[in-house]
Amino acid sequence: MIRRPPRSTLSSSSAASDVYKRQVILRENSANIPSTANVLIEALPYIQKLANKIIVIKFGGNAMIDDRLKNNFARDVVLLKQVGLHPVIIHGGGPQITSYLEKMGIKSEFVDGMRVTDDKSIEMIEMVLGGSINKEIVNLITSHGGRAVGLSGKDGGLIRAKKMVGEGKNKNFDFQNTGMVSSIDPSVVNLLDATPFIPVIAPIGIGEDFKTYNINADIVAGKIAKILQAGKYVVLTNTTGIFDDNGNLIKSMNAEQVRQLVNKGIISSGMLPKVESALEAVSAGVQNVQIIDGTIDHAILLELFTDEGVGTMIRRT
């Protein structure tokens, strides 16, 4: 004999009250659904446009030392790969290098925004960049479900370098083991891009004499964006973007406008290598470069997948 389930002991008014409460909760929860759906719909055309494109990202600044921002960055990168983009990460490590050198009793020196790398510090810098920082980023990406491979410019002959030569008043300055990019061989990056793996590159180069050079990460990122003909080149910084002489954020500017601000001294110091790499990239065919605030949560996604974007866009014309 089939037994019927016992009838509810609740009164009809009590049951009706529970149903009403559930309906109220459902309505409250569904209030956020339209806005969430709108975000996804807004992102769709950008995802379609950038599908199968290489996205070069220069990871640097405070985003590299704040745990929340580091994890958000890793999640963003994994998402890019999942939706069909090909992120290539080039990271800096200035604050970590400076801190480590201070512990070793070595003072950091900068000229025109470039670190001067002496014989005492080059081995330590390579260890910090290619060791602890690079592997931490790889581990973060892995922890959020991605697959990453850490590289330095020495791997696969990726970055060939030569000694940096100063310009203007610093043309005779000896930058010692600070280098310039002489050539990029993207073979190893291209191999990884065709797989589920995300390349994470430390800006260490090797000279023709097999000497190790420390290279500014912004310069390396710009060169790699250029040689890979990246669909996008994104630079994470500690500022909202580029400002005019009145302190107003410039949302979009062309190469000539950037040069004017450099000549006026409005763009200076650590921002110089960033805009120089951006100018080289756009002049070589990269459609545009975004300089964005890496301290904003999910800044990469906001820049790539929303109508408004964040930061400053640099375009060729």
Please give the residue ranges for each predicted region.
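A residue-level signal for beta-strand positions that form part of recognition/binding surfaces
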Residues: G311
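Single conserved hydrophobic/aromatic residue that forms the stacking wall/gate
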Residues: M1-Q23
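Nucleotide/pyrophosphate-binding catalytic subdomain
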Residues: S17, K21-T295, L301, E308, ...
